[in-house]
Amino acid sequence: MLIFFNKYLHINLNILSYIPYRAIFSLLTSFFINLYIGPYFIYYFKKLQTYQIIRNNGPKTHYSKKNTPTMGGIFIIFSILFSTILYCNLSNIYIWYVISILIGYGLIGFIDDYKKIKYKNSQGLKLKWKYFFLSIIAFIFICMIKINNKDIISTELIIPFCIKNDFEINYLYIFLSYFVLVGTSNAVNLTDGLDGLAIMPVIFLTCGLTLISLFSDNINISHYLHVQYVKNSTELAILCMAIVGSGLGFLWFNSYPAKVFMGDVGSLALGGSLGAIAILLHQELLLIIMGGIFVFETISVILQIISFKIRKKRIFQMAPVHHHYEVKGILEPLIIVRFWIVSLILLLISLISLKVC
């Protein structure tokens, strides 16, 4: 929006023409918005009794969280949208693709949270309907970018740590994009089980995508680093920084002991947005490395289900795996910080892959 005012109202704020400045302003704006509105949202959430529903079969340490409000993802989404609309060039179609996923997946998460709170159970939206709506939005997203800009979704798969890192997979790419969107949103959702556990890996991952969006828009740098050239992708860096700032602002209230949880409205929206950005940048496989914590959590659930159905035995004492460590007696803050450390290391490994060959 500021770009529009600067161009057509002749305000002549040259600083707005520089991506790094707008990215920094975007981060700071979303951060301070959350710091300011966070306490108000938490107050009204408590007043409306939007408390987190605790599973009866969950870790006993979680019973102390039963009076902690959820749905904090609402003010995460608000601050991201505010900063994005304020600082991004809104004529850039990539921005609208990500915003559509942010709002669409956020709405599904909101309905899920609302049903949990209303009916006082941890089930919420039925699983089949949840995946149905997530899938519908994912396919609409894929079809729209395929129709409007065929260059965004080429059918080449970029494989990290390979000398020849682009492989033609034809229309399998559409299904890969679908699984990235739906999978990432649910992976973040599964990880969001401890205070601050999910939001910091989201921040790290978004920082990595920020760098790639900057590299991808320069044909010489992208060729040197073996990343896909994506024209005008630098605007995504501003949106990414809005996510980082919003995440840091939310962490202010979500760090142990949490005053608010993001809920499904936040985790599905953030996970879906990261998946969408990775698709636009052609970094679907690199996303798996960057978001290795989310992959680990998801695999732990899948293995637990398969093992119990086939062997009638559990691999972990409880899944997702962060609950396994809780049951083993490891303190929650230790689990959280250690997962953060692993997430940071995975980010660094993924960045090394850009010029490993």
From Swiss-Prot:
Localization in the cell: Cell inner membrane
GO molecular function, a single term: UDP-N-acetylmuramoyl-L-alanyl-D-glutamyl-meso-2,6-diaminopimelyl-D-alanyl-D-alanine:undecaprenyl-phosphate transferase activity
PROSITE patterns, per the entry: MRAY_1, MRAY_2
Keywords: Cell cycle, Cell division, Cell inner membrane, Cell membrane, Cell shape, Cell wall biogenesis/degradation, Magnesium, Membrane, Metal-binding, Peptidoglycan synthesis, Transferase, Transmembrane, Transmembrane helix
Cofactor(s) it depends on: Mg(2+)
Cellular component GO terms, alphabetical: plasma membrane
Enzyme class of the recorded protein, top EC level: transferase
Catalytic activity: UDP-N-acetyl-alpha-D-muramoyl-L-alanyl-gamma-D-glutamyl-meso-2,6-diaminopimeloyl-D-alanyl-D-alanine + di-trans,octa-cis-undecaprenyl phosphate = di-trans,octa-cis-undecaprenyl diphospho-N-acetyl-alpha-D-muramoyl-L-alanyl-D-glutamyl-meso-2,6-diaminopimeloyl-D-alanyl-D-alanine + UMP
This protein's pathway: Cell wall biogenesis; peptidoglycan biosynthesis
GO biological process, one term: cell wall organization
Membrane-spanning residues: 23-43, 70-90, 91-111, 127-147, 171-191, 196-216, 236-256, 260-280, 286-306, 334-354
Record-linked Pfam families: Glycos_transf_4, MraY_sig1
UniProt superkingdom: Bacteria
Record membrane topology: Multi-pass membrane protein
Keyword Protein biosynthesis: no
Keyword Cell membrane found: yes
EC number: 2.7.8.13
Similarity comment: Belongs to the glycosyltransferase 4 family. MraY subfamily.
Function of the molecule: Catalyzes the initial step of the lipid cycle reactions in the biosynthesis of the cell wall peptidoglycan: transfers peptidoglycan precursor phospho-MurNAc-pentapeptide from UDP-MurNAc-pentapeptide onto the lipid carrier undecaprenyl phosphate, yielding undecaprenyl-pyrophosphoryl-MurNAc-pentapeptide, known as lipid I.
Protein name: Phospho-N-acetylmuramoyl-pentapeptide-transferase
Native species: Buchnera aphidicola subsp. Acyrthosiphon pisum (strain APS)
The organism's taxonomic lineage, starting at the top: Bacteria, Pseudomonadati, Pseudomonadota, Gammaproteobacteria, Enterobacterales
